[in-house]
Amino acid sequence: MVTSSSGIKETTDRLRGLTRKELLEAAWREWGNYKGKKIQEYFDTEADPRGNRWHDLSPYTWARKKSSKILTETGALRKSIRFEPKGGVVFIKSDIAYARTHNFGSAVKHIPQREFVGFTEEDRKMAEEIFRRVLRESFSAGSFAVRENR
C-alpha cells in the first residue's frame, strides 16, 4: 500500500472549517434542486409523487377554467414552490394560500387531495446518495491519496 500524506493537514484544516450545518445545508440545497424538478414533473403529468393520477376536476370547475390542466390556471402555484435549507433540515414552502389545501385536500371545501409535495422511497434514496456524495467530496477535496498495490 502506498500512502501519501501530502495535503493531509490542509484537508483536515478545511474539514474543521466546514460545520455540520454547512454540509447539511449544501446537501439539502442539492436535494431541493432534485425535488423541485420532480414537483414540476408532477404538475406536467398531473400525478402525485407515487404516480397516482390526481382526482379529476368537477364539470363545474372545468366549465369555468381557462386551462386544460389540473392545478394550472395561471401557473402561480407550480412556480411558487421553493426550498429553504435551514439548521440541518429543508423546508418546502409556497406563499400561495391555497397550496396546502390542494396538496392535502379539504373535506370542508370538498376539494380532493392532489398531492404535489410528498416524500417517496425514491426521494429518500436520492437524499442518501446526495448526502454520501457531499461528504465524500468534502473529504476528498485535499490532496490526500491512498492507493493499494495488489
Named regions from a protein language model:
Residues 1-150:
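Short, Lys/Arg-rich flexible segments
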